[in-house]
Amino acid sequence: MYSKLIFPLDPNDAVLLEIPVIISQGVSQKYRLALDDLIYVEACQHRLILHTIQGDFTTRCTFTDLTVCLTPSDRFFHGGKGLLINFAHVSLVQVTGEVLLKNGQIIFCSRR
């Protein structure tokens, strides 16, 4: 299964990301997520963790596949090995590489 963007007919509606989400071991189902709700994505142990407003989701989708899908939108930044950040959820970027998110979380970005 691959991820893909779904563009609405009405330009005022949200663009959706359709991605296979792991429900239990060996079981996944398609999940649709508004791009505005996606905070950041990190690669961890051959899986991707999607950190969203609703919570965290895990997928076996490849990082390359998701990067190709998301980076053309200009709202996502490839922040280093295994990290995609949604600029809409960033409050501040420090010169040290620390990124302060609007939810108060701090993540480290190796690319500046």
Task: Give each language-model segment a name.
Residues 2-102, 106-108:
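Conserved binding/recognition cores within well-folded domains
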